[in-house]
């Protein structure tokens, strides 16, 4: 279990990164979930119509119980219900999620649809995924499997606040293989992961250069990693500068969360009272 000090610091860091990435609190309501007790109340109410079987079949739950057998708790099992409460408490129609969250969003639609059917109403909308590009994004990790994320460990992910030196060190340690032995050989997952990240942060010319080198069996993974690290550093530079600027302004950060919580409680309170 994380210690409270770490949780508070993580919350602050996420807020700073959101603001640094360009989210404008004048247009978007930012708040801490624990500042909105109505979420916990709606979570409890939705749990009354959530079934054990469907929760146990959730892919994320099955993955978690494989990796943390010593801490399989009810919160882990019912996490999709909490996520649903987070979404539908404000009657969201569209949700910006990555590809790995598609199942949770489908479960949110299930809970919303079930509530509407049981109580003979069209109260909750059935939210759909909102994507900023042509397809839902899933940035893979540097360890060769899974997605890039904080829960998978520090070495698996590049964080927005990481220094250029740290980014370079992480990318250069990324998992690969011995290299292709046949022309146009299919890439193993660990190598494809690096190409997927390259596609997200580099130019098309850069991607094509390394694709061609791989297909011709002339690729040097060291060169690929150096280029990838350089492009990640350039891609994240504006955000990294803003993080440094914003993180020291504690008064501003508290103001953003206080005003966000007030707006969220007004919206969430209305939903819970009507439910």
Labelled PLM ranges:
Residues 57-58, 92-93, 120, 153:
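A short secondary-structure junction signal
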Residues 66-115, 119, 140:
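Internal, conserved structured core segments that host functional sites
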């Amino acid at each position: 279990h994380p210690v409270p000090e770490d949780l508070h610091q993580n919350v602050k860091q996420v807020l700073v990164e959101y603001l640094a990435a360009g989210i404008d609190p004048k247009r978007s309501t930012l708040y801490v979930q624990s500042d909105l007790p109505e979420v916990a109340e709606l979570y409890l109410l939705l749990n009354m119509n959530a079934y054990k079987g469907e929760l146990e079949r959730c892919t994320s739950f099955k993955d978690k119980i494989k990796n943390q057998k010593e801490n399989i708790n009810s919160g882990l099992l019912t996490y999709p219900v909490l996520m649903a409460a987070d979404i539908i408490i404000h009657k969201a129609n569209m949700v910006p999620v990555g590809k790995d969250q598609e199942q949770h969003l489908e479960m949110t639609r299930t809970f919303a649809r079930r509530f509407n059917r049981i109580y003979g109403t069209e109260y909750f909308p059935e939210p759909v995924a909102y994507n900023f590009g042509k397809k839902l994004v899933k940035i893979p990790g540097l360890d060769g499997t899974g997605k890039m994320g904080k829960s998978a460990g520090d070495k698996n992910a590049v964080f927005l606040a990481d220094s250029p030196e740290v980014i370079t060190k992480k990318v250069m340690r990324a998992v690969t293989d011995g290299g292709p032995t046949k022309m146009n050989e299919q890439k193993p997952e660990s190598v494809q992961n690096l190409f997927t990240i390259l596609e997200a942060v580099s130019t098309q010319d850069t991607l094509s250069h390394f694709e061609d080198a791989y297909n011709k069996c002339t690729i040097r993974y060291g060169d690929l990693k150096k280029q990838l690290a350089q492009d990640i550093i350039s891609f994240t530079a504006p955000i990294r500068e803003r993080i440094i600027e914003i993180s020291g302004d504690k008064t501003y950060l508290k103001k953003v969360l206080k005003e966000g919580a007030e707006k969220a409680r007004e919206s969430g309170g209305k939903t819970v009272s009507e439910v």
